[in-house]
Amino acid sequence: MASGTRCIGSFRGDGFEIFKFAKEATGFTRYRVLDLEQRAREQLAAQPIDAAVISFGANDAQAVFANGHLHPLMSDGWKQVIGDRIDGYVKALRSTGAVVYWIGLPVMRDPQLDAEMQAMDAFYEQHMRRLGVPFLDSRPLTLDAQGRYNAYLPDLKTGKPVLMRTGDGLHMIGVGYQRLTNAVASDLRRYAERARRESGRPVPAATPSGEAR
């Protein structure tokens, strides 16, 4: 499994192998710095995977230069270039038979940036639907009870406020990323159990809490 988010802790001890392919400060608008599709194909050639959990967007809130033209953020040209790059990236991930999940972006502290992220997420969700890729809308999971940004959010088990965000108002800390990926983690466990049964491999025994170990 490749992780583009920080959900690694959700799977420790569950019989999963985790390969972190993520690279900071990259995105679909930055192919002059790093071609994500090419990098993915190189990584997959060295390490095939069964599932990929990916999330992009925070670094792509900018214009994209392609084919001699500068396309403003969310313009038709931007959507065409980014859409084509997403197609190639997902195709590369699926080339090993991997299932792909896309996790949307959390709410941002800065209102203007948050509006841009919402517009981009709407584009990504529509694109993932066309590709048949499950899309997790993480925004509801990152709003407080008043529907606003808050660095502290209630723990899903205890209800007590827990620090989830870093000081920049953009990123999340480990427990915050795990909050976003719980639904995907559950789906991946079911997928892994089906795959193990079909291959004749034993399924890890369930713990008293019901989680596979």
Predicted regions and their residues:
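Structural recognition of the beta-strand scaffold that forms the well-ordered cores
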Residues: 17-22, 50-56, 99-104, 134-137, ...
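Catalytic His-Asp segment of secreted/periplasmic serine-dependent ester chemistry enzymes
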Residues: 107-213
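Stable alpha-helical elements in mature extracytoplasmic
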Residues: 3, 7, 32, 36, ...
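Active-site segments of SGNH/GDSL-like serine hydrolases
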Residues: 55-61, 65, 89-121, 140
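A short small-residue
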Residues: 66-70, 104, 161-165
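Second-shell loop/turn segments in exported
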Residues: 25-30, 72-80, 89-90, 107-115, ...
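Structured segments of extracytoplasmic/periplasmic soluble domains
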Residues: 10-14, 42-47, 55, 89-99, ...
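Conserved SGNH/GDSL esterase-like catalytic core that processes O-acyl groups on lipids
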Residues: 1-81
